[in-house]
Amino acid sequence: MASSSADLHDILDRTTQGTVAVVSPVVNGPQILDMRKVVRTVPVAPHVQEYVVKLTLATHPENRENLLASKYIRYGSSPRGAQTMILGGKVRALLDGRFNVSLEDIRALMLPALRHRIILNFEAQADGRTPDDLLDEIAGKLGTN
């Protein structure tokens, strides 16, 4: 049994806190800014950008071409979702040693970029639909053209 406030603080500190990690910088601020500039120079082919545009707009419920979105989605992705897929695709391409964004990069980033950017309606919840399965289905209908 702890005999004093100091003893109790010592016990709590030793048993409820992790070890203090030693963190040392790997890159500095100017290097990060340079990396951001490099990422933005990676080209995106017109057909890849068009796919991102179609995918983003296909999440909008007012899009009459996509009955899935109008049935289950209350709010679709904003332009930020498209920006995230493009910039993420550029980073992914560089990390893979490529100098251009592929449709595969966009498909790999689609769920992390868009799942939290679409709001489902009550019908989707009642039917057990999730953002991930709806996005996969929407992307499947778009194909990769």
Task: Map each language-model feature to its residues.
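Conserved C-terminal "switch" segment of AAA+ ATPases
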Residues: 1-69, 95-99, 103, 124, ...
